[in-house]
Amino acid sequence: MNEFAIGANREGWQITMHAIGDAAVEQCITAYEAAYADKPWDDARHVMIHVCLASEEQLKRAAKIKLCIAAQSPFIYWKQEPDEYLCSVLGRERTDRLNALGTMHRLGLVVGDGSDGPCTRPKPLYGMACSVNHPNPDERISRLDALRMITANPAYMSHEENKRGTLAPGMIADFVVLGDDPLTAEDIAGIEVKALYLHGKKHVAKKTGVAGLLARAIIKRITQREYI
């Protein structure tokens, strides 16, 4: 893994690695550290995905080399792995740091959010609700930070912060119109999406064919088991 990271970094490629569990996180960070030691690159924005069970010391090392984190906040309330089950397997201390969003933000890491759909509900506002209602109070984040996780931060992680991710003159006009303010609404996950605009034009959903209906049915069957 170190050899791969060193080679890709030398070529100027942005690297993204999955890391679930503290051992996997250790392998991943060690590989990135080896790559940066071989060729320093301040603006690489290399990424770790998931980053479950990372220790604070590991996250400090990630912050030192400016890694970005691609988290999946809906796993915080994933009913396939309830808190009682996780505690029985991992213990309370490790369970509490499964998705350490608060620690990541306090250390200055850039964190983007996703759903890992269809494993969890593919709805950004649902993820935002999970982020601000983490069962461990120390790992909860502010609504504004959670909003950035689904807007500006992913754009930065893909080197597109000058094109998308915020509503500003000159940016690509991809945005949604919401029925309420996610920074103040009582039920973030329940906010209705009133409209979707792509490149400044209102998007109208086309009639779904048989394949689309089947895909939606499968996703609904998978995801309805884990809704909070």
Placement of each model-derived feature along the sequence:
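P-loop/Walker A phosphate-binding loop and immediately adjacent motor/lid segment at beta-alpha junctions
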Residues: 187-208
